[in-house]
Swiss-Prot record:
Gene of this entry: secY2
Keywords for this protein: Cell membrane, Membrane, Protein transport, Translocation, Transmembrane, Transmembrane helix, Transport
Main function: The central subunit of a protein translocation channel (Potential). Part of the accessory SecA2/SecY2 system specifically required to export GspB, a serine-rich repeat cell wall protein encoded upstream in the same operon.
Known partners and oligomeric status: May form heterotrimers with SecE and SecG subunits (Potential). Component of the accessory SecA2/SecY2 protein translocase complex required to export cell wall protein GspB.
Species in which this protein is naturally found: Streptococcus gordonii
Entry similarity comment: Belongs to the SecY/SEC61-alpha family. SecY2 subfamily.
Protein name in UniProt: Accessory Sec system protein translocase subunit SecY2
NCBIfam families: acc_sec_Y2, PRK12417.1
Membrane topology summary: Multi-pass membrane protein
Length: 407
């Protein structure tokens, strides 16, 4: 806690407060030409999109400038990372400037699909002298501009504040999701006893989630020609859940993209029955959505594990620095061992996330109103990962302050 009151941390925290204020202010500015009183249901199927937007700094409840949030940008980063893992594509050989341009173009494509699909299904007001096409174009442009403004705000927070994009997402989650959970409790008329049990099990799960989040498997590392009493403290750490809670957050967003795309197609073919059924099946509560959601979490958890712990880079770095694992040759043998170990924990972590996010969501098949309560474990996983990420950043920034001068 003392680290928080260091001048550097306080300065960064004040900058973050300013950026959060700008974000909150922008999220209150409603899109022009939109009938706010008629957007509550967003064509009757907004639950999935609402949660996906909230998990990425967006807000579909008030249809503001930041309604789609950082979803296009964060989705493009994920897609790009998954492609750069493969050496065959050679994307990691491109210059940083070229990679950034391609990521931004991918962000633009995703933002265009989401913005256009959203605007075309909004209840728009008719204004004298302004055509429907002009209104759609302007609102789509504003939503895309809002996304790029948030990207810029995130970059500023990364360099001047704390948490980077995490702070925007955390504020979005805190602003809307607890309120939704409380409304569900009131709507379902849950008794105080059941509510107390939910609170107790939530605390137990919170404790378990923190343990899993910080749990690590340590591989002893030796260095050539270095023998000292500190040798036993040299390890390669692999987290048990290397992906953290990110797969749950990204899964909700990626699963919502097909729904945006179908909404876009439905505007041009309003009587297409297949499109309407597709939108309904991809809404929360449907079996296709549930299967796709869990499958996406599993795949992302597996992918994130290999992205976060790249066996090729680790083996190459160890070989250059003269490090080796006991009874293993440096190079290919070391790479295979690390890859196999990461694969094992990737499977364990993916299975853990699927159980944590999937089992509580089975409640929605009893009553869709349980959906918000079923999301609580997943929200805990996401939030815990964000909190520890900020804590690690603060610890890194104050690392030098832990050492004192001898004179």
């Amino acid at each position: 806690m003392k680290s928080f009151f260091k001048p550097l941390i306080l300065k960064k925290f004040l900058w973050t407060l300013l950026f959060v204020f700008i974000y909150v202010l922008g999220s209150k500015l409603t899109l022009p030409f939109v009938d706010v009183s008629s957007i509550a249901k967003l064509n009757g199927d907004s639950v999935t999109l609402n949660y996906a937007a909230a998990l990425m700094g967006g807000n579909l409840r008030s249809m503001s400038f930041f309604s789609i949030g950082l979803a296009p940008w964060m989705s493009s980063i994920l897609i790009w990372q998954m492609f750069t893992v493969s050496k065959r594509l050679g994307l990691n050989k491109l210059s940083m400037e070229s990679q950034e341009k391609r990521r931004m173009l991918l962000t633009l494509a995703i933002a265009l699909i989401q913005s256009l699909g959203l605007v075309l299904n909004l209840p728009l007001k008719t204004v004298a002298g302004v055509g429907q096409g002009t209104i759609v174009f302007l609102d789509t442009l504003i939503l895309i501009a809002g996304t790029y403004f948030l990207i810029w705000l995130t970059d500023l927070n990364s360099s001047m504040g704390l948490g980077g994009s995490i702070m925007i997402v955390m504020v979005s989650m805190i602003s809307y999701i607890p309120q939704d959970i409380w409304l569900s409790i009131q709507e379902l008329k849950i008794s105080p006893l059941i509510l107390a049990l939910i609170g107790f099990f939530s605390l137990c799960f919170l404790y378990l989630a923190v343990l899993v989040e910080r749990a690590k498997y340590r591989i002893p590392i030796n260095k050539i020609n270095i023998h000292n009493r500190f040798k036993k403290y040299s390890y390669l750490d692999i987290r048990v859940n290397a992906a953290g809670g990110l797969p749950i957050m990204y899964a909700m967003t990626l699963v919502s993209i097909p729904q945006y795309f179908l909404m876009l197609l439905l505007f041009f073919q309003p009587n297409n029955r297949l499109l309407k059924e597709g939108i309904l099946s991809l809404a929360m509560g449907g079996i296709p959505w549930f299967i796709l959601y869990l499958l996406t979490i599993f795949i992302l958890a597996w992918a994130f594990a290999f992205i976060n712990v790249n066996s090729d880079q680790i083996a190459e770095r160890m070989q250059r620095s003269g490090e080796y694992i006991e009874n293993l040759y440096p190079g290919e043998a070391t790479r295979r061992y690390i890859h196999k170990t990461v694969g094992y924990f990737a499977f364990v972590g993916a299975l853990y996330l699927v159980l944590v996010a999937g089992l509580p969501m089975l409640l929605i098949f009893l009553d869709i109103r349980y959906m918000r309560l079923g999301m609580i474990p997943g929200m805990f996983m996401i939030f815990i990962g964000m909190v520890f990420s900020i804590k690690d950043e603060v610890d890194t920034l104050t690392l030098n302050d832990r050492y004192h001068s001898l004179f």
